[in-house]
Regions:
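Asp/Glu-centered strand-loop micro-motifs enriched in Gly/Pro and often flanked by an aromatic residue
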Residues: 1-2, 43-48, 226
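Short coil-to-beta-strand transition motifs
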Residues: 2-10
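Conserved strand-loop elements at the edges of beta-sheets that form or border functional pockets
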Residues: 7, 43, 99
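Right-handed beta-helix
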Residues: 10, 17, 51-57, 63-228
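Short aromatic-glycine-enriched beta-strand elements
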Residues: 20-27
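Short, small-residue-rich loop/turn micro-motifs
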Residues: 29-33
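Beta-strand/loop nucleic-acid-binding surfaces
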Residues: 34-50
Length: 228
């Protein structure tokens, strides 16, 4: 009867290409086979998981029923330097998934600062969920959207912003500002251009003739233009 090999054995992935796309990898297992030999090991992963290790990754290899003709790779070994720094925490309250190119999904269960972070390792795009709200960052162009409890802010990398609050909308671009709040539209800029067909309107209020002596606050922009 052939020897049976039970338990886990250290292996190294030498080729992760699989024509059938079933997660089979060629591994070397020096403690069982000659060092130059590679054997096809089937994937033994949790249901719904589809992660194939890169070449030269250290993996754990087992054999179905102890039979060396039926190897399985059942997990990866974390050698020094391979652990995601985002998950290097004690106690281990952070769970992370990281791909070879640096794409990262981090679940932080630290009490009081629970959060989820999704990062594009190539372009530095980020989507973060925290107790304060949700933040989306464009890592390539520098734009940003932040949704908090009291406001939503859209920020262009050049400095222009739009802020949405429960009863106000504010837009800023350089020195120009527009604010809509409590039925009032406030425009602050060195030049204000009105669209075609519009005309400057000066509204003094609804005071009657008998109230003409009352003071009426008036704000006049000397740089208002009407576009015909």
């Amino acid at each position: 009867m052939a020897d049976l090999y039970f338990g886990k054995y250290s292996g190294v992935v030498k080729d992760n290409r699989d024509a059938d796309q079933l997660g089979v990898v060629l591994v070397s297992v020096p403690t069982v086979f000659p060092e130059e030999d590679v054997v096809p090991a089937r994937a033994a992963l949790p249901y719904g998981m589809f992660f194939v290790p890169e070449n030269e990754t250290h993996v754990w290899v087992e054999f179905e029923g102890g039979d060396t003709s039926s190897p399985l790779w059942t997990g990866v070994q974390h050698v020094p330097g391979s652990w995601a720094p985002e998950a290097a925490k004690s106690p281990p309250t952070v769970r992370a998934l990281r791909t070879a190119s640096g794409h990262l999904l981090v679940f932080d269960d630290t009490e009081g600062s629970e959060s989820i972070l999704l990062t594009d390792g190539k372009n530095a795009h980020k989507l973060e969920f925290t107790a304060d709200g949700i933040t989306l960052t464009d890592g390539v162009n520098g734009h940003r959207i932040a949704m908090g409890s009291s406001a939503i802010e859209i920020a262009h990398q050049g400095g222009a912003t739009v802020t949405l609050e429960s009863a106000a909308v504010k837009a800023t671009a350089g020195a120009a500002k527009v604010e809509l709040s409590a039925g009032v539209v406030t425009v602050d800029g060195s030049v204000v251009l009105l669209g075609a067909g519009a005309a400057p309107v000066l509204h003094l209020g609804d005071q009657g003739i008998g109230n003409l002596g009352a003071p009426v606050p008036i704000t006049i922009s000397t740089q208002t233009k009407v576009l015909a």
